[in-house]
C-alpha cells in the first residue's frame, strides 16, 4: 500500500535536550511539500559533528533529530520535484546546491546560501518542520536529520546515486569521506611531492590522509593523541605518525624540526582552537597552507601571532571538502564503485539503529573510526 501523501509513523532517535542520551521514539513524518523529498533512510554514519550538538559545543534548538551522513531510497516526492523519483537511491546533502546563489554560481564556492549550518533554524526552508513526536514539533538538523527511518529534505539537498551502490558503505560520502578527501584534493589542492600534516585521525582525518596520498604527497605526517589510530593511518597512506604526548615541546616545533621549514599543507580535523593555531604555525612560513575542517566550538575565539600570516602563510576553511554537493556526490559514488578509493577501512562498526547510544559511546571513547547504523 502506497504511503505517498500520507503521514508516516516510524522510529527515530530524538534528542530532547543536550547532554542526554538519544531516546528511540515513534515520530510522525509529514508528506513532502512542493520541491521536497521524503527518504527512507537505510544506513547512517555517526559523525563527531552530531556529538557536538549533544555536548553543546554546537548550539541547536531542541528537541531535534540529528544525523547528516546517510543513504537511502526515495519514498515519495512533492510537487515540482524532477531530479529524483520514488525508488531512487540517494544521499541527503547537508550542504545543498540550489544552483542560483553566489556560492553555487562561483567556480570557487560550494557553501550554498540555502544551507542551515550557520542560521541553525532547525526548520525546512519554509520555516516549518516535518517531524512531530508526542504532539511536539521536532527540529531538523542541517537540512538532513538522518537518525530516523524516514526524513524529508529539500530537492536542493539530495543527490541521486548509482542503483548498485552499497548504501551501508557510500553513506560516508554524505559527510566524513567527502569532507576529508576533498579538503586535500579540492580545497588545498595538494601538489605532488609535497609534505602534509594531518591533526586528528578520526574518519575525516583519515580521509584527508587518503586525499593527500591520492594527490601525490611524498610525506604525510599523521598526528593524534590516540596511538591506536596510527596503524590505520599508515595503512591509508601516512608516512609518519606523531603523538604530541610523547614530547614536552609544542607540536608545531616538533613538526618544524621534522621538516626543516614546516609542512606545505596542514589540516586541522579536531575542532580545537589551540590545534588550529598549531596547524597554522606548523606550515612553511612563506607558502604553507593550513585548512580548518574541525567544527569550531560555539562562542570560542582564537588568538594568534599575525606575523604567522604576514610572512605568507594561507589559512582557510573547508566545508564538505569544497565539493559542489549535487554535482560531486554521484561522481564520488561512481569513483568508489570503480575502486578509485576505499571506504571499508573507515568503517569499524556496523550496528542496528536502536544501538545508536552505544555507537556514540564508541566514538567518545576513541574506539571507533566510523560506526554505521543500519535500519
Curated annotation (Swiss-Prot):
<feature type="binding site">
    <location>
        <position position="370"/>
    </location>
    <ligand>
        <name>NAD(+)</name>
    </ligand>
</feature>
<feature type="binding site">
    <location>
        <position position="175"/>
    </location>
    <ligand>
        <name>Zn(2+) 1</name>
    </ligand>
</feature>
<feature type="binding site">
    <location>
        <position position="112"/>
    </location>
    <ligand>
        <name>Zn(2+) 2</name>
    </ligand>
</feature>
<dbReference type="InterPro" id="IPR036291">
    <property type="entry name" value="NAD(P)-bd_dom_sf"/>
</dbReference>
<dbReference type="InterPro" id="IPR013149">
    <property type="entry name" value="ADH-like_C"/>
</dbReference>
<dbReference type="GO" id="GO:0005829">
    <property type="term" value="C:cytosol"/>
</dbReference>
<protein>
    <recommendedName>
        <fullName>Alcohol dehydrogenase 1</fullName>
        <ecNumber>1.1.1.1</ecNumber>
    </recommendedName>
</protein>
<dbReference type="Pfam" id="PF08240">
    <property type="entry name" value="ADH_N"/>
</dbReference>
<dbReference type="GO" id="GO:0042572">
    <property type="term" value="P:retinol metabolic process"/>
</dbReference>
<dbReference type="GO" id="GO:0004745">
    <property type="term" value="F:all-trans-retinol dehydrogenase (NAD+) activity"/>
</dbReference>
<dbReference type="Pfam" id="PF00107">
    <property type="entry name" value="ADH_zinc_N"/>
</dbReference>
<keyword id="KW-0007">Acetylation</keyword>
<comment type="subunit">
    <text>Homodimer.</text>
</comment>
<feature type="binding site">
    <location>
        <position position="101"/>
    </location>
    <ligand>
        <name>Zn(2+) 2</name>
    </ligand>
</feature>
<dbReference type="GO" id="GO:0042573">
    <property type="term" value="P:retinoic acid metabolic process"/>
</dbReference>
<feature type="binding site">
    <location>
        <position position="68"/>
    </location>
    <ligand>
        <name>Zn(2+) 1</name>
    </ligand>
</feature>
<feature type="binding site">
    <location>
        <position position="224"/>
    </location>
    <ligand>
        <name>NAD(+)</name>
    </ligand>
</feature>
<keyword id="KW-0963">Cytoplasm</keyword>
<feature type="binding site">
    <location>
        <position position="47"/>
    </location>
    <ligand>
        <name>Zn(2+) 1</name>
    </ligand>
</feature>
<keyword id="KW-0520">NAD</keyword>
<feature type="binding site">
    <location>
        <begin position="200"/>
        <end position="205"/>
    </location>
    <ligand>
        <name>NAD(+)</name>
    </ligand>
</feature>
<keyword id="KW-0479">Metal-binding</keyword>
<dbReference type="GO" id="GO:0008270">
    <property type="term" value="F:zinc ion binding"/>
</dbReference>
<dbReference type="InterPro" id="IPR013154">
    <property type="entry name" value="ADH-like_N"/>
</dbReference>
<keyword id="KW-0560">Oxidoreductase</keyword>
<dbReference type="InterPro" id="IPR020843">
    <property type="entry name" value="PKS_ER"/>
</dbReference>
<feature type="binding site">
    <location>
        <position position="104"/>
    </location>
    <ligand>
        <name>Zn(2+) 2</name>
    </ligand>
</feature>
<dbReference type="InterPro" id="IPR002328">
    <property type="entry name" value="ADH_Zn_CS"/>
</dbReference>
<feature type="binding site">
    <location>
        <position position="98"/>
    </location>
    <ligand>
        <name>Zn(2+) 2</name>
    </ligand>
</feature>
<comment type="similarity">
    <text>Belongs to the zinc-containing alcohol dehydrogenase family. Class-I subfamily.</text>
</comment>
<feature type="binding site">
    <location>
        <begin position="293"/>
        <end position="295"/>
    </location>
    <ligand>
        <name>NAD(+)</name>
    </ligand>
</feature>
<dbReference type="InterPro" id="IPR011032">
    <property type="entry name" value="GroES-like_sf"/>
</dbReference>
<keyword id="KW-0862">Zinc</keyword>
<feature type="binding site">
    <location>
        <position position="229"/>
    </location>
    <ligand>
        <name>NAD(+)</name>
    </ligand>
</feature>
<feature type="modified residue" description="N-acetylserine">
    <location>
        <position position="2"/>
    </location>
</feature>
Amino acid at each position: 500500500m502506497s504511503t505517498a501523501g500520507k503521514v508516516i509513523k516510524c522510529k527515530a532517535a530524538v534528542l530532547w535536550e543536550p547532554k542526554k542520551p538519544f531516546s528511540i521514539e515513534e515520530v510522525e513524518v509529514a508528506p513532502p511539500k512542493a520541491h521536497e523529498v521524503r527518504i527512507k533512510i537505510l544506513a547512517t554514519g555517526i559523525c563527531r559533528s552530531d556529538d557536538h550538538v549533544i555536548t553543546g559545543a554546537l548550539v541547536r534548538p531542541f528537541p531535534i533529530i540529528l544525523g547528516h551522513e546517510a543513504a537511502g531510497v526515495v519514498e515519495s516526492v512533492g510537487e515540482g520535484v524532477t531530479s529524483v523519483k520514488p525508488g531512487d537511491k540517494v544521499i541527503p546533502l547537508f550542504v545543498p546546491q540550489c544552483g542560483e546563489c553566489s556560492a553555487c554560481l562561483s567556480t570557487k564556492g560550494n557553501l550554498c546560501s540555502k544551507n542551515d549550518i550557520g542560521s541553525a533554524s532547525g526548520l525546512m526552508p519554509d520555516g516549518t518542520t516535518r517531524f512531530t513526536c508526542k504532539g511536539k514539533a521536532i527540529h531538523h538538523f542541517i537540512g538532513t536529520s538522518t537518525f530516523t527511518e524516514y526524513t524529508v529534505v529539500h530537492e536542493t539537498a539530495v543527490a541521486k546515486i548509482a542503483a548498485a551502490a552499497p548504501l551501508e558503505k557510500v553513506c560516508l560520502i554524505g559527510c566524513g569521506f567527502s569532507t576529508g578527501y576533498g579538503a586535500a584534493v579540492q580545497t588545498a589542492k595538494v601538489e605532488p611531492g609535497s609534505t602534509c600534516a594531518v591533526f586528528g585521525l578520526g574518519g575525516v582525518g583519515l580521509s584527508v590522509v587518503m586525499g593527500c596520498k591520492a594527490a601525490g604527497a611524498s610525506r604525510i605526517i599523521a598526528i593524534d593523541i590516540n596511538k591506536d589510530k596510527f596503524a590505520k593511518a599508515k595503512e591509508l597512506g601516512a608516512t609518519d605518525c606523531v603523538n604530541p604526548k610523547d614530547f614536552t615541546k609544542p607540536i608545531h616545533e616538533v613538526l618544524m624540526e621534522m621538516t626543516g621549514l614546516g609542512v606545505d599543507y596542514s589540516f586541522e580535523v579536531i575542532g580545537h582552537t589551540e590545534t588550529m593555531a598549531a596547524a597554522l604555525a606548523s606550515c612553511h612560513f612563506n607558502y604553507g597552507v593550513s585548512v580548518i575542517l574541525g567544527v569550531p566550538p560555539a562562542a570560542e575565539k582564537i588568538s594568534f601571532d599575525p606575523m604567522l600570516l604576514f610572512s605568507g602563510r594561507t589559512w582557510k576553511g573547508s566545508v564538505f571538502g569544497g565539493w559542489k554537493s549535487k554535482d560531486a556526490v554521484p561522481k564520488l559514488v561512481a569513483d568508489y564503485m570503480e575502486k578509485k578509493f576505499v571506504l571499508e577501512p573507515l568503517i569499524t562498526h556496523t550496528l542496528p539503529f536502536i544501538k545508536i547510544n552505544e555507537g556514540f559511546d564508541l566514538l567518545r571513547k576513541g574506539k571507533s573510526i566510523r560506526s554505521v547504523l543500519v535500519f
